[in-house]
């Protein structure tokens, strides 16, 4: 087991040094360039899209077409272990002076460099968070408007990514679609099905032996983040502030500085729920595996007008859902079928 972990970390470092990777950008695996914004060379459609990532660099991007624990995946109730937010010791200080906001060509990214999280016996520092449109992970087969990826790194270069779904305000006077409120939508509506999907996840009985196998070192006493017990039901002030500057970085390679960012709101929202966790991969080239994923059951929301502003800059930037963990890579299987 130790040997396989060492190999994964070696490959992760080797691959990330050879390719542009949004997911790992700003970490020790792929340091941020001083004084400029590097524009990614891969894409999401045509000859540079996910089905062609292998051919952009066959040696570096081999895992994109052969890896068997690839991300994103469909987040289905009971498929992966659940971790209460109270076990993550999640702390992110406010960025009162604002921070850099960059257009990498394939996403827009907020530079962090501060914030702490602990998973099992490993401590992580928040490096950056970026966005995908639509969501890369699925919620029981359904995509969401967007997904935020918060990229964390440990002292020994292990990577963890916190995924947070982002909904668009429904325009009905407050609650965003998909979030739970005191006035629940009818059970047959899409909003209710999204809501009930997360409720099912949180209520599925745990197989503790299964949890221990997937999550060594998680358990015992952990610091509990004090937070309200309900998810945010209005557009996120944090996201509205960040995206308020998105028009300033409409061109790849540009950057600006955000206004003051209140991270406490985000911490409170995440701390109100749990995370479905699994070991997967970067969702961008080189698709390296050994990445710890923690996908929150709490959704954020933005205004419809904000969504359109972001969409005009990002466009489409989602990798297609991958097969079940441990199964043959879809691209590899298809290649063998047509030989």
Predicted regions span which residues?
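Alpha-carbonic anhydrase
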Residues: 4-9, 13, 17-339
């Amino acid at each position: 087991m130790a040997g396989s972990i060492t190999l994964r970390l070696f490959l992760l470092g080797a691959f990330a040094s050879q390719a542009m990777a949004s997911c790992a950008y700003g970490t020790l695996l792929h340091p941020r360039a001083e004084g400029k914004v590097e524009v990614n060379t891969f894409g999401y459609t045509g000859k540079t899209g996910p089905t062609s990532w292998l051919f952009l660099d066959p040696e570096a991007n081999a895992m994109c077409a052969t890896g068997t624990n690839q991300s994103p995946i469909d987040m289905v109730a009971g498929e992966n272990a659940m971790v209460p937010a109270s076990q993550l010791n999640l702390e992110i200080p406010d960025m009162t002076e604002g921070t850099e906001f960059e257009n990498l060509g394939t996403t827009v990214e907020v530079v962090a460099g501060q914030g702490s999280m602990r998973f099992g016996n490993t401590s992580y520092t928040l490096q950056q968070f970026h966005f995908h449109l639509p969501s890369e992970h699925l919620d029981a087969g359904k995509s969401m408007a967007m997904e935020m990826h918060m990229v964390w790194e440990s002292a020994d270069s292990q990577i963890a990514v916190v995924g947070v779904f982002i909904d668009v305000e429904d325009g009905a006077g407050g609650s965003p679609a998909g979030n739970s409120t005191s006035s629940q939508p009818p059970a047959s509506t899409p909003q209710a099905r999204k809501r009930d999907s997360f409720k099912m996840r949180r209520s599925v009985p745990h197989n503790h032996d299964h949890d221990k196998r997937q999550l060594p070192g998680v358990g015992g006493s952990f610091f509990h983040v004090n937070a309200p017990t309900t998810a945010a039901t209005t557009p996120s002030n944090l996201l509205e502030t960040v995206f308020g500057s998105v028009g300033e970085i409409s061109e790849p390679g540009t950057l600006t500085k955000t206004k003051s960012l209140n991270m406490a709101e985000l911490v409170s929202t995440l701390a109100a729920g749990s995370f479905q966790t699994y070991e997967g991969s970067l969702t961008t080239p080189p698709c390296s595996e050994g990445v710890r994923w923690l996908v929150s059951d709490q959704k954020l929301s933005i205004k419809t007008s904000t969504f359109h502003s972001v969409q005009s800059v990002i466009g489409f930037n989602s990798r297609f859902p991958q097969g079940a963990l441990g199964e043959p890579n879809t691209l590899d299987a298809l290649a063998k079928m047509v030989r």
